[in-house]
Amino acid sequence: MDGLQRCFDQLAWPQADQAAKQLGATLVWPFGACEQHGPQLPLATDALFADRILNSVFEHLDAALPIWRLPVQSIGFSPEHQPFPGTLSLSAELMLQLVDQVGGQLASMGVKRLVLFNAHGGQIGLLQVAARQLRLRCPSMAVLPCFIWSGVDGLQSLLPPAELAHGLHAGQAETSLMLHLAPELVGPSRPVDGAHGSGSIHAPPDGWSLEGAAPCAWLTSDLSETGVIGDARLASIELGSQLEQALISHWTQRFKSLLCSDWPPTKSVVDWPRKS
């Protein structure tokens, strides 16, 4: 399947109507951001990753499968990066409205599933809230918010522990992937900033974290002067290629599993509270 040939916005309206009404019709909406990614990576880093990885995943899917993609949402929720020039951010309220309005229209067309294919870590929680609200309003359509880096097999063997734990932004992983996908967009500076290990002046209190079980609501300026959180000096084209293959393999299997399922379950509405 050619990802470029599965663009929902490039269909004429009769084709779009037919696509949306296919059994199990699934739309994938890639989400990125327009935000600083250190002095070496472009503002569109997350949008580019979501777009390129999704197109590559589509190339590994059977052309007969009822799945299409929407244009990438290239401006997202990025308040943590706003002190840095170039960053553009929508409000949380506007993001919720955006997902609700677009998702509601897709549901009314007959779409069975909407996947929010997100590459920006700063809007994971917000898209989960948006998905839950949309699912409640449109119970006939499944809504699946996902983060492209979550649950990917092989990352632990490809990245050192320090980068897995603290390389959150424009560090080794993102710089390597960009070196592989679009090397012309990578600047010469490869900084390291924010040593957030035990004893660091910028480390969260004991038992708390930047992400994970007990996260802090941090701003990039709390942690870094350059916008990099991690060590971009470790980046390489070879690692970027390995990361791309891990991402493609992971999401190809996830989409195949979804498309072969009957999710969301169909069930009758139960009155609550139940009468004894």
What are these model-derived regions, one by one?
Residues 1-113, 121-276:
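Extended, histidine- and acidic-residue-enriched regions that form the cofactor-binding/catalytic faces
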